[in-house]
A protein has these predicted regions:
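Domain-level recognition of nuclease-like catalytic cores that cleave nucleotide substrates
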Residues: 2-5, 111-153
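Hydrophobic/aromatic beta-strand patches that form the interior of the parallel beta-sheet core
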Residues: 50, 77, 123-125
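Catalytic cores of nucleic-acid endonucleases
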Residues: 81-131
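Generic beta-structure capping elements
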Residues: 52, 79-82, 144-145
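Short amphipathic alpha-helical face segments that pack within enzyme cores
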Residues: 37, 55, 101-104
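Conserved catalytic cores of phosphodiester-cleaving nucleases, focusing on short active-site segments
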Residues: 42, 64-85, 102
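Acidic-basic catalytic patches of nuclease active cores, encompassing PD-(D/E)XK
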Residues: 1-53
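Active-site metal-binding core of divalent-cation-utilizing nuclease and nuclease-like domains
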Residues: 48-74
């Protein structure tokens, strides 16, 4: 069962399910579409989705896009949707401030939940969105990314 804290407008999801793509001009819709595509991609790879847009009970600013299980491994996923015309990749947009926020979010999740698996990792999914509705979306899955100087323990 997926626990969803916030996930956009249901009509948008329905449109995407029947094959209609966004206009790629609305940044919020682009982000939601990117998260939807990322989630769909991981499900097709056999991941179990535990949480969408998880937020800490203690501090609502701490947010994780997806929390999944890949067999026995707990996976924290950051999804970065960008225009294919961007000068930087989605992975490159995870700057110092975002890394600090992600680290705090992961630590909050680990401290607020018991019965955690022994192994966990951090993945990034880049979603390159076309500049128009006729273009193709490209997804890149970066597994087990080491973006923290500190450990999560």
């Amino acid at each position: 069962m997926i626990k969803m804290f916030h996930y956009g407008h249901p009509w948008r999801t329905f449109k995407w399910l029947i094959g209609l793509t966004p206009k790629f001009t609305d940044l919020k819709e682009n982000g939601e579409y990117g998260e939807w595509l990322g989630r769909k991609f991981l499900k097709n790879k056999g991941f179990s989705i535990l949480y969408l847009n998880w937020r800490s009970r203690k501090d609502r600013r701490y947010e994780i896009d997806l929390i999944c299980m890949d067999n026995e491994i707990l996976v924290f996923v950051e999804i970065r949707a960008r225009s294919v015309n961007s000068f930087t990749t989605g992975f490159q947009t995870i700057g110092k401030r975002k890394r600090r926020a992600l680290l705090k979010s992961f630590k909050a999740y680990l401290s607020e939940n018991s019965h955690l698996p022994l192994n966990y990792r951090f993945d990034v999914i880049e979603v390159d969105l076309p500049s128009n509705c006729n273009g193709k979306v490209k997804l890149f899955h970066h597994e087990n990314i080491a973006i923290f100087k500190d450990t999560l323990h």
